[in-house]
Every structure is written in C-alpha cells, then in structure tokens.
Amino acid sequence: MSYLVVTIKVILITGMPGSGKSEFAKLLKERGAKVIVMSDVVRKRYSIEAKPGERLMDFAKRLREIYGDGVVARLCVEELGTSNHDLVVFDGVRSLAEVEEFKRLLGDSVYIVAVHSPPKIRYKRMIERLRSDDSKEISELIRRDREELKLGIGEVIAMADYIITNDSNYEEFKRRCEEVTDRVLKNG
C-alpha cells in the first residue's frame, strides 16, 4: 500500500545522538520541506501508552516487539497524511527495517542522509544542550550510543546515500548540508 504518489523526494536522516540531525532537519524546513521528527511521533504515543517509569527508548523497543520493526516508520507516514511538499524529511531513522518500510510506503525516491560527528564532539554537544533525554554523564552517553547501535543505526549509516560530516563550525556544516540537499533535489 502506498500513501503517496511519489513525485516528491524523501530524505531519511540518520546519525548518532548529538551528530547534528536536528540541525540538518531545521535547514531543510527553512527550504520548505515537510519535516517529521520520528522521536516526536513516538513521544506522542508514549504520552498515552507508556508504562509507569518506562523510558522512551524502552517504549519504542516494546512498540517494535508488538507491531514489528517498521512500526515507527508506519506511524510517521500516517502522521504525514497527504502532503503537497516537494521534499519530505523524516528525522531520526534507526534501522534498516524502517528504511524498507519507508520505501514500501513512499516509493523509490527515498534517500538516506547520515550526519556523522566524532564521539567527543557529540558528547560535548549533548552535555551542553538542555534536552531532557540527554545525560550529563559520559558513561550514560556511551550506553545510549550502544543502545542505538543495537537497534541497527550503524547499518543505516553504512547504507547512506550521502554522509554529511559535522566536525567543524556551524557555517561549514550548513554549507555541507546545502550541498547534499542540492544534490538530492537535482539528481537524487
């Protein structure tokens, strides 16, 4: 079943926590893309269905166990509804099962863009930002990385059509993002 007749381009953003995925998504939104943050879609369900004391990541794992590994992708496509955007972005792809589900539902104009940043830079960013799901302890950040890798995020990064390295200043990162976006929109 396809939800859209795809004359649009779809970008699936992946990357480890703190790599710059959300910043890339913001830049795409500024260019007119429809952006759906996958963790926000999970959080919406979490607020209704989570067990007392259950962590968001554990809730997402439980959803996958019950409904299959592509469930978050399906929920995100449902969230998309009918879109009149030329570019649709899903921020936070974590497994190849999700990639396959997006391709099954949205067609072949789906491109994986990985945002990569070295661990020391990512950890520094996460300690400095004020997100509720970020720990301030390096050991917890390393544990979170391992959990993400167990979900299959490393395989998605390895299969990326494009990789943006985020190891410099914001202006350089923005330039790299624009370059990749232009390539996707022009050539696919």
Swiss-Prot record:
One of its GO terms (molecular function) is ATP binding. ATP binds at residues 15-22. Coiled coil: none annotated. Pfam families: AAA_18 (PF13238). InterPro entries: NTP_hydrolase-rel, P-loop_NTPase. Keywords: ATP-binding, Nucleotide-binding. Belongs to the UPF0200 family. HAMAP family: UPF0200. This is UPF0200 protein SSO1041.
